[in-house]
Amino acid sequence: MNLCTDQLAMLVADDEQLISVSALAADPLNSAMADQAEKYPLNHGRAEEIHLLDPGLVVTGRFHAGPTVDMLRRLGIPVVVFDPANSLEAIRENIARMGEVLGQPGRAAEIVRAFDQRLAMLKAPVMRPLRAALYFPNGYTRGEQTLLGDIVRTAGFANIASDAGVRTGAHMPLERLVLAEPDVIITGSRHDGKSRSENILQHPVLETAARWDRAHQLKTSDWVCGTPQALAAVERIGALRGTLMGGR
């Protein structure tokens, strides 16, 4: 019933262990495992529909740990709550925990080993980090104590949000972003149709940066959840750093 824990469960579980995943898990804009999610009945995270599925266990994220989880527990359904991963290390921990919860510790350990091996290949010595701005709808940015912040750091960039004292997430005025003079501006996937919250991403400042190869869209599904797919974001941002350094 949660986008991120659903993906962890699909990674670790046998097919017959899962009876339903959330509709968001089948949304390719947000889910790196949308195709796999379509194999299962979809739910919308409501206690009534979850109860009718008669699950032996529900796994969900901390952001869902509210009235729905309370109701499920009152109905006698065990619920395991996961904290969202705010770092690459936390991804490893959540995979291992999901393996224990679903009785698949060996499979989880294999996934963690593969994760570690790929991460080691992507970590390159960085003599001088370039500076990146993370900028999203409504002028929202993410700091170093977030998964995306850790991804950017691992790929060899310093996050300008740190200079503004942002550790998790906050609004950043466009003027402050411009004055910071980042080497690159990283944004997320755009939704179909026009959203008022995304208007700021069409500002001439960002469009000019894009024309000069200084603004790049990162697939939201790569980093919005703490799964091994986050390493695809590390790889893409690392390649971007190589391109920028090659032009100097």
Question: For the regions a protein language model found, what residue spans apply to each?
Answer:
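Structured C-terminal subdomain patch of bacterial secreted/periplasmic proteins
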Residues: 90-100, 109, 184, 188-248
